[in-house]
Design a protein with these regions (language model features):
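PLD/PLD-like phosphodiesterase catalytic module centered on the HKD motif
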Residues: 1-344
């Protein structure tokens, strides 16, 4: 679905309450002119005076290079810092995390902090609102998982004292973030900071009694694939789906049917590939940048959505050892059709 993230950030109830004091963005690429002109004023009106952007070193260098003439407020109204590389992988996760004493708003998905990522591309985001009077277990788990990741990143790397001060302010202001959250069977937030997403998926299926059960169907929406389809093959060989459907925008995808077919396992049907485009007249050339993996089981369906493409650096590797840093939401439903709307 088409949402404008700017409108979610400035959604009335929160801005009127002025309930926020801090915001953290994780992004791969960024456009600081877009941020200063469009996003920063909205954050200020919501009460966010403590704003931190954590980005990939390449994205950081590119943003400074392209924006050096217009960028006016970096280091004053907000801090932008690159997450140091620990190996060959890039910082690829994408979130907006807004918090205050009794407020929380979290967007976790596929869009970078750019005009394209927040308004123009087709992206997918999970959206969570913390309500102190009635916080759902899913919401508490989402916020605590992301907050733990942010603290790991800032604790394990050499960041300027300014950044550490910003993290301490959040810890002091939003003490509700430290509530204990319980692990859930039907919902999780996974990063590959110290364990691969593939490992977490296979462990989760085992824990809920699905290990060894063949999938009815596997549906994938991802622009990027390994050249030889290694990660797609891993899903096929380990989850035994009766059918695999791949949805992509042919002009914006690295899916190479010939090279993937060359190493495709015998006895498993090759994926059915669907070329898709935005169906609305006003977006004929829209870049489809979202990422989804939907598994249809005997009794229900699960969906993994977020920043991870169908590649080994995203799903099979750990950030500390060569993977891209990714962040995804897992949801499980007893309804096999629960996630059909995402691919319609």
């Amino acid at each position: 679905t088409m949402i404008n993230l700017k409108t979610i950030i400035e959604e009335d109830s929160a801005v009127k309450r002025g309930g926020y004091s801090s915001a953290i963005f994780l992004t791969y690429t960024l456009n600081l002119n877009f941020f200063e002109q469009i996003i920063a004023p909205v954050l200020e009106s919501a009460g966010c005076s403590n704003v931190l952007i954590l980005t990939d070193p390449d994205g950081y260098a590119e943003a400074l290079e392209t924006g050096k003439k217009q960028v006016a407020y970096a280091g004053m109204r907000y801090v932008c810092a690159p997450i140091p590389r620990v190996s060959s992988g890039v910082q690829h996760s994408k979130i907006l995390f807004m918090v205050g004493k009794e407020s929380g708003r979290l967007l976790l998905g596929s869009g970078n902090l750019t005009l394209n990522g927040y308004s123009l591309n087709l992206e997918n985001f999970s959206h969570y609102e913390y309500n102190p009077n009635d916080p759902s277990q899913e919401t508490l788990l989402a916020f605590s998982s992301v907050w733990k990741l942010i603290q790991k990143i800032t604790n394990d790397n050499q960041f300027p004292e300014t950044v550490q001060r910003q993290i301490r302010k959040i810890r002091d202001d939003a003490q509700w973030l430290n509530q204990n959250s319980i692990q859930l069977e039907n919902f999780a937030i996974w990063s590959n900071y110290d364990q691969s997403i593939w490992t977490q998926l296979t462990k989760w299926r085992k824990d809920i009694g699905l290990a060894g059960n063949p999938l009815k169907e596997l549906r994938i929406f991802s622009p990027y694939y390994d050249k030889d389809g290694a990660m797609l093959r891993r899903f096929a060989e380990n989850l035994f789906p009766d059918r695999i459907e791949v949805y992509l925008s042919p002009e914006n995808s690295t899916f190479n049917a010939n090279s993937i077919q060359a190493s495709w396992p015998e006895g498993i049907d090759f994926p059915s590939v669907f070329g898709i485009h935005d169906s609305r007249e006003e977006h004929p050339n829209r870049y489809l940048h979202g990422k989804l993996i939907v598994g249809i089981e005997d009794k229900g369906a699960w969906c993994i959505s977020g920043s991870a493409n169908m590649t080994r650096p995203a799903l099979d590797q750990v950030w500390q050892r060569g993977g891209n840093l990714e962040l995804v939401t897992l949801q499980l439903s007893s309804d096999k059709k629960a996630f059909d709307y995402l691919l319609e």
